[in-house]
């Protein structure tokens, strides 16, 4: 059989294209990989992602008409939230009712590049309009906060038949929750230009601040409420940068004061140059590596630190990938484990529903006002931030700690950003309160609903709290929802952690 040269060239091009695409997918998210596994779409689900989903809602067009903005952005998602028809009965102020609603839409953060940030805002289910406003930011870079809404902290859990059920334990039961797909290009957030993507934490913080200023104009009832910024993993970079930017802007008398009270970072990458030095010891003392393998990991760590010190950012990223963020990588080769989110598990777990496929249904996209925009894991987000990943935000903590409350928490069994990585970073913060904090006793923490089992360990001094949550991995609210809620509730409400 004769095979033409053009046919062979075509096959070769296809193979090369596939390899390139696969290599790009592997690089999407080094610290919060968006390749978390989900069940495939069941055969009996009619997947209608290609159908028209109507017009997207750009709320920046309604900054002078917040009544219309609320009516247009309201989502009829069902219990426990009120029907949007009931919103029409309210004159304009959400504080006029104890009913609670949920809202979605886009806010334009850069008109030049048509950069638009998607959000999902859920009023507190307790009906108290004075409830703190809690922003949740996912990691990545490129992890959508919608993940937490459906998998960790939000009021809904997605089953594998595309059915939403109410989550038994949700942060939304006591707090107004604002999930932001950040940075631009993540999830439903998008930009029309490569110039619209963020290249560093300053640009991300500026976009988030622009977003928040407009959010308060659209939902002015929440402007005076206490604000907390929370998140996990690579959001350990976003949250300090964003909160520091707010503090700086608050000190400018020309800007309206934002009532920021605290930040909460779970298993956060904040200072790569110190945190990366802990992998060899962590692997050895948990029995995952022997002495010889520990030495190899020490060599990797030293090379990463050297690359960071020399500002060779791409080299540092590549070395990190070789050490732990493949596959293939050294960690997986010596342990046989691919789940660095939880050392108790060999492979990443499969979650009960594919929230990406669920959100991309045309009926859902129409309901949440995104139109024909699609939820995506955008590799461009990572590419633009690649040079910023090894850089630190630790230098921002002294100013933050002098102005607001801070809680840093870790899951006991997380490997990628485990407790020892956070502890090492904390000990190098140049803050006047760091020594009394380190000298404060660690207490054993138990929650009222389970006064037998130890929930975790807490160290606290003035505005600074550190928590290790027992029996949890990288995603604490998923692994230990009751403990995570008790922790965040006590932190926000200034309640002491009960000891055993």
UniProtKB/Swiss-Prot annotation:
Biological processes per GO annotation: proteolysis
Gene encoding the protein: cpvl
Function per UniProt: May be involved in the digestion of phagocytosed particles in the lysosome, participation in an inflammatory protease cascade, and trimming of peptides for antigen presentation.
Active-site residues from the entry: 233, 414, 474
Keyword Secreted: yes
Gene Ontology annotations for the cellular component aspect, listed alphabetically: extracellular region
Subcellular location per the Swiss-Prot or TrEMBL entry: Secreted
Lineage, uppermost ranks: Eukaryota, Amoebozoa, Evosea, Eumycetozoa, Dictyostelia
Molecular-function annotations in GO: serine-type carboxypeptidase activity
Entry protein name: Probable serine carboxypeptidase CPVL
Organism: Dictyostelium discoideum (Social amoeba)
Signal sequence residues: 1-23
Location, primary (coarse class): secreted
Glycan attachment sites: 110, 161, 333, 360
